[in-house]
Amino acid sequence: MLDVNFFDELRIGLATAEDIRQWSYGEVKKPETINYRTLKPEKDGLFCEKIFGPTRDWECYCGKYKRAPFKGIICERCGVEVTRAKVRRERMGHIELAAPVTHIWYFKGVPSRLGYLLDLAPKDLEKIIYFAAYVITSVDEEMRHNELSTLEAEMAVERKAVEDQRDGELEARAQKLEADLAELEAEGAKADARRKVRDGGEREMRQIRDRAQRELDRLEDIWSTFTKLAPKQLIVDENLYRELVDRYGEYFTGAMGAESIQKLIENFDIDAEAESLRDVIRNGKGQKKLRALKRLKVVAAFQQSGNSPMGMVLDAVPVIPPELRPMVQLDGGRFATSDLNDLYRRVINRNNRLKRLIDLGAPEIIVNNEKRMLQESVDALFDNGRRGRPVTGPGNRPLKSLSDLLKGKQGRFRQNLLGKRVDYSGRSVIVVGPQLKLHQCGLPKLMALELFKPFVMKRLVDLNHAQNIKSAKRMVERQRPQVWDVLEEVIAEHPVLLNRAPTLHRLGIQAFEPMLVEGKAIQLHPLVCEAFNADFDGDQMAVHLPLSAEAQAEARILMLSSNNILSPASGRPLAMPRLDMVTGLYYLTTEVPGDTGEYQPASGDHPETGVYSSPAEAIMAADRGVLSVRAKIKVRLTQLRPPVEIEAELFGHSGWQPGDAWMAETTLGRVMFNELLPLGYPFVNKQMHKKVQAAIINDLAERYPMIVVAQTVDKLKDAGFYWATRSGVTVSMADVLVPPRKKEILDHYEERADKVEKQFQRGALNHDERNEALVEIWKEATDEVGQALREHYPDDNPIITIVDSGATGNFTQTRTLAGMKGLVTNPKGEFIPRPVKSSFREGLTVLEYFINTHGARKGLADTALRTADSGYLTRRLVDVSQDVIVREHDCQTERGIVVELAERAPDGTLIRDPYIETSAYARTLGTDAVDEAGNVIVERGQDLGDPEIDALLAAGITQVKVRSVLTCATSTGVCATCYGRSMATGKLVDIGEAVGIVAAQSIGEPGTQLTMRTFHQGGVGEDITGGLPRVQELFEARVPRGKAPIADVTGRVRLEDGERFYKITIVPDDGGEEVVYDKISKRQRLRVFKHEDGSERVLSDGDHVEVGQQLMEGSADPHEVLRVQGPREVQIHLVREVQEVYRAQGVSIHDKHIEVIVRQMLRRVTIIDSGSTEFLPGSLIDRAEFEAENRRVVAEGGEPAAGRPVLMGITKASLATDSWLSAASFQETTRVLTDAAINCRSDKLNGLKENVIIGKLIPAGTGINRYRNIAVQPTEEARAAAYTIPSYEDQYYSPDFGAATGAAVPLDDYGYSDYR
């Protein structure tokens, strides 16, 4: 068997009949499958043992040879080779066809490859192949030319004979008529009778003339057809063809069916044809040139690949191994079989019948009919349903052909090659495990025992609890007491992977150290729920076991949950306290005026109270019940660092050192909170709202190693749960308070609504205006009720606590519960002008309940659609970007993009750019950042983290040039410096990181949060697409809905205002030709933008516009942007537009992820003029390949090719990839394979998908080449240590062995030398 790791590329081509016979182990001659009595395969049938190998190991068909010693012998009685039965999975057979057939992929695909090659229309081709017309395959022009005059003379003689015969017959008939008339006259017959006779005579003479004329026309037809006869000419009229053969058979050959196609291909001169087509392209115009281009693609493919076009017509059909199309017996004596067997049986039956008919010398028409049926049966085998009605099995179900086995979600590619099921896995319901550390999970005992069974069995044998593996297995199955101790030992330090479907981003699979727990549920750490998007309402998770040492090392170092705190999309922590924990910390750090033990200043004879010498003393007071944790106190602190401003004031330049005392005015709760933070973190004297907690953890992630952050969030979690329990926050009916002012507020608005209603009835308002007015009124009412509610609720109300702390929910939900529901929408997405006035606490009326259901149901339907759409978007994004891998450290390019850090306000202060987090943050600086005095603030090549950005802003720098993947010069993949910091680790990205996949996941994962609907803005204007449809529109590079024109040139605008349309003319500044935009619908509205004088207003007559400026409301067409402003601008445009959609939903994704995808969309160039290169005009070429080829041609002194960049949608870009395996497994499988086979395409196996399909390690992460070939070289100390002989007393282990926490060791602590 071929080892998959030893080949570098995979080529696909056309198989000729010779190849098929070479693969085959014998010909299948009979349609029989299995003998129904003996259940053994029939000889020469579809399951024949002689061809495909024995059905049982080392046993021939007749039973003469049994068992392994006879290996390799071929039995002389039954002819079966004695070998393993698994060869029935590998050995192929073939069927020798009695007549050739065409391969349906090449004839019926769009475009028809056979048609392009032979220059025949697909309709004509179909007529020939399915025996409806004859085609001329060759003409002996020389012989015809030489003997033309002789033949013409013969033809003239024949015509003369016909004419003479006609004239003779007419003469005789005329004489007979004369005689008849004379006779009648003599008898004195009436004129009537005479007229009848005359008419009859004339009619007969007319018939004679017509008959002769028909004969002459036929001769003329035969002659003209013969003189113009040329190869590839179609003759549909059978009689005409027969005549031609009878008369001039020796001058030409013709036939019908696939044989004629085979002949035509045999006589086809590829080189000459390619030359003549190139000629046409050089000198031709219009349709002719286009057709020649398309044909040249196919012809050149055969010319360059060395494929023989004969492979498109088959003389033999391969039969796949029988184990791949099995036949199994069901209970009840019936058989279940693969559809392929039925399809093969039809082919064999028809083929055998055709052979018999040919042997019998049957009439041509019967033989042709049988050949047509054979062609149809082979078509059905290869691609059932591609032409005509599909062949159906029982119950009118179309049979699954070979193509169907590859196509679609259930096909071979997506079902078995890209999505395999995994051994050593289990799944169960998850429950919360608040006692766990961040890197741990609770694994049910029974599940762990089953997962680790082989390890436990081996260990039982090692420890002599069992004699052999078999008894060990028995012990495990009977769950003997010793087994549990061994299991504890085996699972220690062996990480497991937990996965929750749907795995939307890479944090959907993380590694944990298992702890054995009772019960059958997996326990999950509460902080990783965010990353998994898990909750405990019945979610299930799967467990997988990494087996090899390398897999365990990767799981521990790269996938352990405590090393994956940051989100790969935004680089901000995901493992944050949420829900109960937030409530707990919020409660703990709240300050309640007048609470027990509050600080009282000294007054008169009372000394001050509520002052404590240390946190320990305060805690003691709290335990005795004289101090509340939420009361304001003064406390002397020595182990907590003061806030920055106090530190500067108290300790000056030297700064605070642990042990320095300072006095804090705070609450005991806040002191306890700060003790959870790492030593040396400035004291935070605030109420811990969710946002504040997030900011602190963010800051920790920037400044401290991951291990510290992990320990801190774990402590915060414990404290959060502890205090949430003690806070007693619960929700009961009594907590939902209805504001007493609600009725009077609603009465007031009811009056206003009545007024509007009256105006409408008087006709002062139309229907739309009335609705708008009512909607406005009730929106105000709802807000006012909300306001009243807010004032009415006390601060310690649990519902308000939950909302205010940011734990969950928002004020709208509180208002719905206790205030009023407000306006709801109808199924069209418009507001219903009657509001829901009740709150859920009071209960809804029947009508209110009914109108409320619209929105609720639409929400559910929307969510389901969104999930599917978003999943499909992610799949396309992954597909287009899967080969973007970091391949080198630095591509040394000078180029980059400019990002804004801040804007100067009119008074000179800097206003920080709101999107700095997703644009400049975590990038590499492209040039030195210099302030006005010329001092370098941050050097080129520095990573921009929060401290660096703050430094730049402090120096007054408003924009910087950063490296970006859009300008990266690496030919395949990207370089680490252009990509910048990896968002998930906070360090420069590693070589081998699959940044394409990460980008696709980061964009796709929040996809489900985006809205589905297109929202209406202002009612009158065009719908502006938003949400998920807009993201799809951008990535697919479609022309947007409500497309807005952009200025082609810089110049002055002349605006002509028509009745229904605008006409905009731009007069260019450089005096060029005027640009006119005609018939622009007024519904679209003119664009508002900043003018030269700084004012913001609508575009009007005489305004000055820059090139690329949008003139109307709506969205610019990216293809237009590319045409007018070039590739750089369109890249920036796409990134900006995609970000707008995500920001509207409050989703933070870094620009670099979108840039990776956009880079893939602009990878190709379309060739305009091929110069001296091999490229075909109009073809799409990878930019790197285009530039390399041009350099080569110029170096040889030739003309370079001219091309222009082209923007491709992600689906198109995925299908245009160089890897045919990846494209075929994505969409349109048959089309991709057809094309790849004709071009003899080679797959270089650069991307991830192709390697997964063939089962190689993926070329990313530790699978990249440079990491595969590492040899470990021991240091001198290691060598010395290896040769010292330990004495008996020597500690074999380090003294602290066994005291380890099991937490991951931070990689930062190890010094790595350069790994090359």
Curated annotation (Swiss-Prot):
Q: Which SUPFAM superfamilies match?
A: beta and beta-prime subunits of DNA dependent RNA-polymerase
Q: Which GO terms describe its biological process?
A: DNA-templated transcription
Q: Which cofactor does it need?
A: Mg(2+); Zn(2+)
Q: Which domain of life is it from?
A: Bacteria
Pfam families from the xrefs? Answer: RNA_pol_Rpb1_1, RNA_pol_Rpb1_2, RNA_pol_Rpb1_3, RNA_pol_Rpb1_4, RNA_pol_Rpb1_5
What does the note accompanying the cofactor annotation read?
Binds 1 Mg(2+) ion per subunit.
Recite the UniProt keywords alphabetically.
DNA-directed RNA polymerase, Magnesium, Metal-binding, Nucleotidyltransferase, Transcription, Transferase, Zinc
- Binding-site residues, Zn(2+) 1: 60, 62, 75, 78
Top EC class, one word: transferase
Q: Which family does it belong to?
A: Belongs to the RNA polymerase beta' chain family.
This chain belongs to the protein called DNA-directed RNA polymerase subunit beta'
What is the originating organism of this protein?
Answer: Mycobacterium bovis (strain BCG / Tokyo 172 / ATCC 35737 / TMC 1019)
The gene name reads rpoC
